[in-house]
C-alpha cells in the first residue's frame, strides 16, 4: 500500500484492518506482510482462493519478553499456530500451576485438537512438551526441523535454539494438531525470517 493510499484511507475514518490478497498464492502472511503488519499494529485479512484468512497482530515470535500468562511459552505456541492458520484458545493460567496439582497441557491438548505422536516422527510445527524444573510437563516448544526449536522460557527472550541433549532429556512428549499440514509451517517460518531482518 502506498503512503498516499494509506493517508487517503485515514481521511475516510479509523483504519481497523488491512485487507489484501494473494491471488493463487498461499493463505499465510509473507515475510514482508509480517514486517508491515507489526509496524501497522493492525489485524490483516488475507483473501486467498476465495477465502478470507484473518490474522490478528501478534508480536514477532522471537525477541519477546517473558511474562507468565501474558507472553509465555503457551502464548508463543498459540501465536505461532495462529500465523499457521490454526486458532488455539487462550486460557487463564496461574504462575506455578504445575506445583499446585494442575497439569494444564496434558489436560487440554487433546480437547484443543492435538494428538500425541512418537518423537521419532517429529516434523516442523509439532509441539514438544517439556518438564522444565518439574516432573509435570510445564513448557511447550515448537519443533522447527533441522534439530531446532522455538520457545520462551522465564527470564529470557523468546528464541530459536538447538534441540540439544539438554532439551531432549526434558522432553515429555510430542504433539501434532489434527488440522496441521506441512505447508502451514510457512506462516511461522515467514515470521521468523521477518523478525531476523526487522530493522
From Swiss-Prot:
The keyword Transmembrane does not apply. It is found in: Host cytoplasm. InterPro entries: MPN, NLP_P60_dom, Papain-like_cys_pep_sf, VirAsm_ModProt. Its EC number is 3.4.-.-. It is an enzyme of class 3 (hydrolase). A motif (JAMM motif) lies at residues 20-33. Residues 40-186 form the NlpC/P60 domain. GO terms for cellular component: host cell cytoplasm. GO terms for biological process: proteolysis; symbiont-mediated cytolysis of host cell; viral tail assembly. Plays a role in tail tip complex assembly. The tail tip complex is assembled successively with three tail tip proteins J, one tail tip protein I, one tail tip protein L and one tail tip protein K. The tail tip complex interacts with tail measure protein to initiate tail tube assembly. The formation of the tail tip complex is completed by the addition of tail tip protein M, which is followed by tail tube polymerization. May be excluded form tail tip during maturation and would be absent from virions. May be involved in tail measure protein processing. Belongs to the peptidase C40 family. This is Tail tip assembly protein K. It comes from Escherichia phage lambda.
Amino acid at each position: 500500500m502506498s503512503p498516499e493510499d494509506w493517508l487517503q484511507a485515514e481521511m475516510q475514518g479509523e483504519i481497523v484492518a488491512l485487507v489484501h490478497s494473494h491471488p493463487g498464492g498461499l493463505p499465510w502472511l509473507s515475510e514482508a506482510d509480517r514486517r508491515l503488519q507489526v509496524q501497522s499494529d493492525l489485524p490483516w485479512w488475507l483473501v486467498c482462493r476465495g477465502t478470507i484468512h484473518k490474522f490478528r497482530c501478534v508480536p514477532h515470535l522471537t525477541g519477546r519478553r517473558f511474562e507468565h500468562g501474558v507472553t509465555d511459552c503457551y502464548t508463543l505456541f498459540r501465536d505461532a499456530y495462529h500465523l499457521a492458520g490454526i486458532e488455539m484458545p487462550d486460557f487463564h493460567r496461574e504462575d506455578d500451576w504445575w506445583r499446585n496439582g494442575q497439569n494444564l497441557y496434558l489436560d487440554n491438548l487433546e480437547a484443543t485438537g492435538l494428538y500425541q505422536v512418537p518423537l521419532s516422527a517429529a516434523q516442523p510445527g509439532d509441539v514438544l512438551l517439556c518438564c522444565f524444573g518439574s516432573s509435570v510437563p510445564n513448557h511447550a516448544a515448537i519443533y522447527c526441523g533441522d534439530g531446532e526449536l522455538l520457545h520462551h522460557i522465564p527470564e529470557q527472550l523468546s528464541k530459536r535454539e538447538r534441540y540439544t541433549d539438554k532439551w531432549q532429556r526434558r522432553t515429555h512428549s510430542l504433539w501434532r494438531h489434527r488440522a496441521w499440514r506441512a505447508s502451514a509451517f510457512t506462516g511461522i517460518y515467514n515470521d521468523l525470517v521477518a523478525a531476523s531482518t526487522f530493522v
